[in-house]
Amino acid sequence: IVFNPKSEISYLYLAKIFKEEENDGLEENNLNTVLLLNPKNEEAIYLLALLNIKNSNFSKVKQLINTLNTVCKKMCSSKLELQSKLESSLKSE
């Protein structure tokens, strides 16, 4: 990041590290940075949607699923998984 602050991959890896450490705030910050650098980064959209499901921010999840629908090339099956997790989270509320 020091040598190339526009490296979306570096921020994505940082987000994954913070996910493992269960630091939701820093995970979200880094995922948002990835999406600022590349709004079509499917993995960042997916991880941010999972984080928002965990935090019960369901309107944001729906928005992210719609975004994933429009940019999807490699992770198209992930949108079905997200939709399923969203539905089960909504039922448990």
Which positions does each model-derived feature cover?
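Structural signature of tandem alpha-helical TPR/SEL1-like repeats
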Residues: 20-33, 55-64
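Structural marker of alpha-solenoid helical repeat scaffolds
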Residues: 3, 37, 70-74
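Residue-level recognition of tetratricopeptide repeat
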Residues: 7, 41, 75-76
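Terminal, low-structured helical/coil segments at or just beyond the last alpha-helical repeat
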Residues: 62-93
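Canonical tetratricopeptide repeat
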Residues: 13, 47, 81-85
